Structure formats: C-alpha cells, structure tokens
Amino acid sequence: MKDYDELLKYYELHETIGTGGFAKVKLACHILTGEMVAIKIMDKNTLGSDLPRIKTEIEALKNLRHQHICQLYHVLETANKIFMVLEYCPGGELFDYIISQDRLSEEETRVVFRQIVSAVAYVHSQGYAHRDLKPENLLFDEYHKLKLIDFGLCAKPKGNKDYHLQTCCGSLAYAAPELIQGKSYLGSEADVWSMGILLYVLMCGFLPFDDDNVMALYKKIMRGKYDVPKWLSPSSILLLQQMLQVDPKKRISMKNLLNHPWIMQDYNYPVEWQSKNPFIHLDDDCVTELSVHHRNNRQTMEDLISLWQYDHLTATYLLLLAKKARGKPVRLRLSSFSCGQASATPFTDIKSNNWSLEDVTASDKNYVAGLIDYDWCEDDLSTGAATPRTSQFTKYWTESNGVESKSLTPALCRTPANKLKNKENVYTPKSAVKNEEYFMFPEPKTPVNKNQHKREILTTPNRYTTPSKARNQCLKETPIKIPVNSTGTDKLMTGVISPERRCRSVELDLNQAHMEETPKRKGAKVFGSLERGLDKVITVLTRSKRKGSARDGPRRLKLHYNVTTTRLVNPDQLLNEIMSILPKKHVDFVQKGYTLKCQTQSDFGKVTMQFELEVCQLQKPDVVGIRRQRLKGDAWVYKRLVEDILSSCKV
C-alpha cells in the first residue's frame, strides 16, 4: 500500500483496463479535474531487464507532443513501482476495428493512414524511430482520432537521424528485412517498411507475410513477395511496392510519402505532420485557474508549469487544457471532492484497518474495449450479469491506451527482454511544431464493461451452470492446480484441461530466445495481486451505489464492432453452446455469469493468450450477441482462434 500513497493523493483508481507482460493499466479519475486517465502500473522487481525499456518510453513521451501521439501526463516512481499517467483513449485498438470490418475501404484507409503518417513523420522529425509500428499500438480516442502508443522500443540515434542502429527488435511480421538480418539500419527506413505492412493490413485485412513457421516467415520477408488482392487499386499497389522494397535504399522516403499521389487523393494537400499542441505558449485560462487554486501569482505559476516536470502540476495543466479543448469549463474541484462513482474511502479504510491490498481477493474486472455504457461498480457475489447504466464517461470505445491496451494500451501485449536493448537512445530536448484530420466511423458493432460474478468453476466439459440456474445455488469454488512453471500474472483457474496446447504466435519476437529472462514470481499471493486487490476493495465498499440487479440476465449493450450477432434468442443456450466448443479448441476458461474468461497455454504451462467472451443482449428485441475482447497475446493468433470458435458454434 505504501507504494500507492502518493498516487492516491491525486487519482482514484477504477478497474483494470489492460494487462501486459510486465504492466497493468488501470482506469482512474484525476481528482482535481475529474478527467479520466489511464495509469500504467509497473513493478520494478518484475520488470528486471525490461526496466531500460520503460525509461526509454518515459523519456520519449516527455519529448513528444502531437495530436496523434498518446499524451503522457504524470510520472511517479517509488522504491518498487513506476506509474505512468497517460491519456485515456476510449476508442480501442486499430487492430480490433480492422478485423471487425474484415478490411477497410480505400477511402477509409486513406483517412486512417494519413494520421499514422502524420504521427510517424513527427516522431522522425524529433530524431526518434518508433521501431514497433503495428495495429495494436494505434488506439482511437473519443473523437476517433488515432493515437500512437508504446514507445518502449523507440530509439534516438546518438548522432543524427542518419545514424545507423544495431538493435534487433519489434514484431517479426512487421519488421524490415535489414532489421531481421541483423544488419545496421536507419530507424526511419525500418519504420517506413512497417507502415507498408500496416497499409496492406488496412486494405486487405491480413498480413502480406505470414506463416506459422518462424523460419518460413523470415524467408518470405526476405524475398519481399506478397499476394496482391484483386480489389486493390493501381495507385495503392504502386504505393505498397514503394514502401515494401527489400532494399531500404530503394524504399520511399518519409519526405516523399507525405505528398504521395495516393496520400493526397481527395485531399489535394500533403499530410500535415507538425504538432498542433506545442509547449511554446501556455494557455491563459489554465494558468489563471491554477494560480487561483494554488494561491500563487501568474508569473510564478507560469514558471513552475514551464519546467515540465511531469509531476502533478504538469498533469493538472494538461488535463485542464484537454477539458478546455472539449468545451468544458476550465475549473478545478476541491481536492476533497470524489470523482465518479468510486470514492477515496476504500483506501482510507485499508490504511485504518492495517489491511494489505496484497491480501484482498481480486475482482478481476478488466476493462472491455468499445464500452459505451458501463457499470463502475460490480457485485462479486452475484451469479448473474448486471444491466449497465449509462455513465458520463462515454469516452473509450475501448482500450486502454494500451496497454498494453493496448492501450493503454487497452490491453498490452509486449515482447520481453531483448526488445529493450536500445543502446542507441540518448536524451535531447524536443522542438515543437503543428497538424490533423478527423474521422467518424460508421455505426460500430460494440461491447461493454464486463461485470463481476462469482466464479463458477467447471469440473467436466459437459456440466455447465448457466447464470439463471445458478441463482438459487450455493456455488463451491474448486481450487485448480496450476503448473509450477506457469508465468502469467493472473492465474486462470480451470477445470477443463486440454492435453494439447497449440496456440503459437506468428509474430514471435525477434529475440524470442530471451523471453524467459523476466524474473519469475517467487510464489503466488494467497489472495491475489496488489492491483487486483484495489478492484476488490472498491467493489466491496461501493456496492450500495449499484443501480439494478446483477441477476437480471445478460447485460444489454449497444451494437459495437466487438460484438458478433447470432440467430439465437436464448442467452443461456448460446452460453452453453460456447462452453461446449471451448474445450474442443484447447481453451481453458472460467465462467462468471455470462462472461467466460478464457486462456490458452503452451505445453509447458505458459499462458499464451487471454481473452473474454461474453453473451450479451443487444439493444434490439430478441437479439443475442457475443462480445469479444483480447486481454493478452498475439493479435493475429487471437483473431484466428476466436473466428474458429465462433464459426464452430451453431449460432
């Protein structure tokens, strides 16, 4: 709890919205402004050799300010933890949107791709190379503008942008040929290749170079040969050819990409890559409000803000600025005022009772991408699903940011160990400049925050308990043995253990040999992790604030791209159908109401994939759907697995 003392002075923590290999992302409320943020929480001991990667990401984000880059607000470091407070991106991963549409039209692709080019061109102008460009590292904000996240693998060459890098990193399916060969390379040229892969994925819905065998995939990338679908236009084919040149010297440069004919079609002007959010001029209204609040004169406050320490003052100023940009009053609240539905009381009670958050059972509430309506508080003792209520925070049509959400990212799938060896990084201050375009998606297909229910552990593949039948039962939670060498942060209990685990990532990291370098847990805590304990305490102490019952059946959600509609009208029938299919696909799961928390494991017990499937009632008469959400694991493996599961269901 001591590590959280400073953080809890300024933020109220809500549910977990993303998980990754070494981080967890929580939704939180900034107390003074009432603005929602995403807080990336990392344990230094768990990070091990990944610690330099986090330092790299922090330094990069302190120097980058752009309308298409996820904004860093605040950095807190304690003896054991690092907290990064980041912009809250409710729109979810670009990857999820692509697979929901199968592929994007050329016009839609152009809108999206211009934003990607804008962000990457700005990154390059500041002397950085991102080196991990992929759809999972691009999130949508509440206005459906793209935000680039995850700068843990970025590099800032020591000399200039023409300095050749040596480190082999990134995801194989998006990595440039010169990078995977181990040659020295220019970061900007490698990024252009990755952007070419992105462009192909946007217009085609699948990877240009793909194979289950890593060596076969390596050879395909080195040959540079890929299928050209018949629906691609001649101009888009030409651009792909120019970006996916195996020889980096023949590859199109970023300068020429900005005003490429395909890029400019329907726009008639080049991509505006300059920053529209420079730090050069402070906003008068925000400075005045902070001066009044802190009882300082304007000049003193301007001087303090201009230090850009990324402390609470920086966070408050930037969040006030964000409020103003959305047309909200530039006003700070009393520090004693509680945000949203969750109060600071739980944390006070913890201290007064000498509880340790390590000793509280986790609520396991993971934020679901694409949430429009969601319930902030849930009842863990309920066996049904709560009917969500509309929240004032309708921002996130998903993610995390990535967590690692991605997302912050929602959700955050990262490649460990060797990706971090960024010897090329050096610190230099950033300059400012300006850019951008807006994009409204068609009516999405949607999920909602998942509610908490008592775990119903399945002990045989054929005995399932639907929430409606379980209402009058006393459920006995059966402990499940977990492999000793399993390394997941959240150990998933399961009763249906498959003899065969076959999920392997296509996008294996280039330094896969080092994947086990991250220190293993010395032993699972009896009642769950510290962060998960926060969820539980908030749940227990705010239960009275619930609206509606958790026993009313599946939640009613708005249509969203993360929801698959079915022909069935009975939610219990659909739930049983899914549960009968999962063991056949070698997927272990835990049932909580109408939500199934699923995972796959390797032959050695290592968790390779975590995702959720929730049966929901759409806001139309007699329409039942399945909400899908990836929590951890390779995005393309997840896509294939979930498609296989859903196609096998008789729905």
UniProtKB/Swiss-Prot annotation:
Record-listed Phosphothreonine modification sites: 56, 167, 398, 409, 478, 494, 518, 539
Reactions this protein catalyses: L-tyrosyl-[protein] + ATP = O-phospho-L-tyrosyl-[protein] + ADP + H(+); L-seryl-[protein] + ATP = O-phospho-L-seryl-[protein] + ADP + H(+); L-threonyl-[protein] + ATP = O-phospho-L-threonyl-[protein] + ADP + H(+)
Effect of residue 171 to A: Abolishes activation of serine/threonine-protein kinase activity and has only weak activity
Membrane topology: Peripheral membrane protein
Chain residue ranges for the region called Autoinhibitory region: 326-651
Ranges where the Protein kinase domain occurs: 11-263
Consequence recorded when altering residue 286 to A: Abolishes dependence to reducing agents
Effect listed in the UniProt record for changing residue 70 to V: Abolishes dependence to reducing agents
InterPro entries tied to this protein: KA1/Ssp2_C, KA1_dom, Kinase-like_dom_sf, MELK, MELK_UBA, Prot_kinase_dom, Protein_kinase_ATP_BS, Ser/Thr_kinase_AS
Keywords from the UniProt entry: Apoptosis, ATP-binding, Calcium, Cell cycle, Cell membrane, Kinase, Lipid-binding, Membrane, Nucleotide-binding, Phosphoprotein, Serine/threonine-protein kinase, Transferase
Protein localization: Cell membrane
Tissue: Expressed in placenta, kidney, thymus, testis, ovary and intestine.
Amino-acid positions noted as binding ATP in the UniProt annotation, renumbered to this chain: 17-25, 40
Catalytic machinery residues: 132
Consequence recorded when altering residue 415 to A: No effect on interaction with PPP1R8
Role description: Serine/threonine-protein kinase involved in various processes such as cell cycle regulation, self-renewal of stem cells, apoptosis and splicing regulation. Has a broad substrate specificity; phosphorylates BCL2L14, CDC25B, MAP3K5/ASK1 and ZNF622. Acts as an activator of apoptosis by phosphorylating and activating MAP3K5/ASK1. Acts as a regulator of cell cycle, notably by mediating phosphorylation of CDC25B, promoting localization of CDC25B to the centrosome and the spindle poles during mitosis. Plays a key role in cell proliferation and carcinogenesis.
Domain notes: The KA1 domain mediates binding to phospholipids and targeting to membranes.
Disease linkage: Defects in MELK are associated with some cancers, such as brain or breast cancers. Expression is dramatically increased in aggressive undifferentiated tumors, correlating with poor patient outcome in breast and brain cancers, suggesting a role in tumor-initiating cells and proliferation via its function in cell proliferation regulation.
Entry protein name: Maternal embryonic leucine zipper kinase
Organism: Homo sapiens
Gene encoding the protein: MELK
